């Protein structure tokens, strides 16, 4: 086991604080509408330019191991805020730095760290309740666009495209961000349920221009097994032919004689038909077939529940207004399922999301909710260069997370104003002893730090602005982009309540741990063994 370097008390805390300040000072320059850029060197390719706090934090690794421990703990604050709300990473870092600096001053003055931490925790719990009381719902498109704009460093085009995407696919829809090919941002919306399985034979194509299969008002047969014998399909085919409507078959696979017969029937115009494989694998395939059944008002023909394909009738088939199938994807538009059943299924999947432990499972379940509830929108980010593309994509993703958080828990006045209003309501809060009171004051003072940093980055006098905002009431605050004092919500400067709340909670949690640190242990660097001396070629002298 390698030897360790151990430091205690103030010696340990000073080193840790140095690391905290190095990381936080690099991150906090990005805060606010006039936040600066940070350039990140990459081992290959062009450097990355970013205003995203968590991207800056993730790049920082310090040579001094004790300083690095402090930096890594603040990095954890940014990462947790990012995971919980998708934004607010810089705010969380600024809050953590302020609490740690103020808290460690009190510890150095002889205060009991445990009581300080209890005081900080009391203040934060009360502040979170105040933030919830200040919160207003964020339902309309204008408010969503404003939240997106603020999160994307005052880029209104980003806010507007996110609001448009949310309007089209609903609050439950999936919105993804991709790198586009054009200079402008583009929005692609897929209505209905789309899954990544294309037609099983190109002979099903009936739209030669687009190379796709278009079925209007089709029946949809859902089968949880492979179909290779055409005799199993005959009763359904005869019923569909009599109804003079097209048929989509979604099965584990359709092969051999069954596929050949379907192709021949389609080409002769006897039955307009297309077949695709069911999406997913294993249990996920069964679940997705059931989703399609509920969306279209049909039944999954499965021998597990005693249903046989030969005995299927038209009542067992789903229906939709239109189905479009390409080589890679199938889209079912306007399924005929019962809305109450669809909402019940969505609620059931949401419960599974709550219980899921892996991010992959959560993502897949969220996709299923979107396909049932709304649709899928893809924002294609446009930029002139690759460097700009990466920077803009980061901002769009942040803004998207922020708008989701705003829809979820509402919004508060932005620009650090909500934290100042929450702190002013807690001026009468007292702890169990004087040291807890100091902890409460540490937290309340730290809650001014985001506003001060926004003002500082804008090149204005932070103390003057902080005093003016503190003297105001309600949503009165300072617009750092224009230098104007007014109602922040009316000016469109909003922060999602969830983002502000998460930033404060995570910052206080990690800062509390750092304040109560009494010893730090790290491995001593290994000393390289001395190189072997050059032996030469002794005893060979005199040779010509």
UniProtKB/Swiss-Prot annotation:
Its main location: cytoplasm. The keyword Nucleotide-binding applies. It is an enzyme of class 5 (isomerase). One of its GO terms (biological process) is protein refolding. One of its GO terms (cellular component) is cytoplasm. SUPFAM superfamilies: GroEL apical domain-like, GroEL equatorial domain-like, GroEL-intermediate domain like. ATP binds at residues 30-33, 51, 87-91, 415, 479-481, 495. Keywords: ATP-binding, Chaperone, Cytoplasm, Isomerase, Nucleotide-binding. It catalyses: ATP + H2O + a folded polypeptide = ADP + phosphate + an unfolded polypeptide. GO terms for molecular function: ATP binding; ATP-dependent protein folding chaperone; isomerase activity; unfolded protein binding. It comes from the Bacteria. It is found in: Cytoplasm. The keyword Iron does not apply. It holds the Pfam family Cpn60_TCP1. InterPro entries: Chaperonin_Cpn60_CS (IPR018370), Cpn60/GroEL (IPR001844), Cpn60/GroEL/TCP-1 (IPR002423), GroEL-like_apical_dom_sf (IPR027409), GROEL-like_equatorial_sf (IPR027413), TCP-1-like_intermed_sf (IPR027410). Its EC number is 5.6.1.7. Forms a cylinder of 14 subunits composed of two heptameric rings stacked back-to-back. Interacts with the co-chaperonin GroES. Belongs to the chaperonin (HSP60) family. Together with its co-chaperonin GroES, plays an essential role in assisting protein folding. The GroEL-GroES system forms a nano-cage that allows encapsulation of the non-native substrate proteins and provides a physical environment optimized to promote and accelerate protein folding. NCBIfam families: GroEL, PRK00013.1, PRK12849.1, PRK12850.1, PRK12851.1. PANTHER family: 60 KDA HEAT SHOCK PROTEIN, MITOCHONDRIAL. This is Chaperonin GroEL 2. The lineage of its organism: Bacteria, Pseudomonadati, Pseudomonadota, Gammaproteobacteria, Vibrionales.
